[in-house]
Amino acid sequence: MKILVKIRLTRVGTHKKPFFRIVVMDAKTKANGAYIENLGHYDPVLGQVVLKKEAILAQLQNGAQPSETVKNILSQEGIWKEFIALKDANKKRKAALSKAK
């Protein structure tokens, strides 16, 4: 049985000073519950984003679903476009292997 995981934001900032971690967690876990892996952080006040690119790509390739906000952040950083390119390359490679057989 495969566990459905999501990449989403969890708030760790104080009152009127938002700060978010970008984490991988089970889809059924509460928003501020336990997470599997920390993939970076986002500070909307300063507009600062720090991401672990390789870890994010690995989680996406394993089937993790990003939330809309995280997907927008990944698009702005160029990681989402890279993931789509990797996904298309894998499809083409699998198609070529199946034709070769």
From Swiss-Prot:
Keyword Ribonucleoprotein attached: yes
One term under GO cellular component: cytoplasm
GO terms for MF: structural constituent of ribosome
Pfam families per record: Ribosomal_S16 (PF00886)
InterPro entries membership: Ribosomal_bS16, Ribosomal_bS16_dom_sf
GO BP annotation list: translation
Record key words, sorted: Ribonucleoprotein, Ribosomal protein
Ribosomal protein recorded as keyword: yes
UniProt-listed Gene3D superfamilies: 3.30.1320.10
Family as reported in the entry's similarity comment: Belongs to the bacterial ribosomal protein bS16 family.
Protein name, per record: Small ribosomal subunit protein bS16
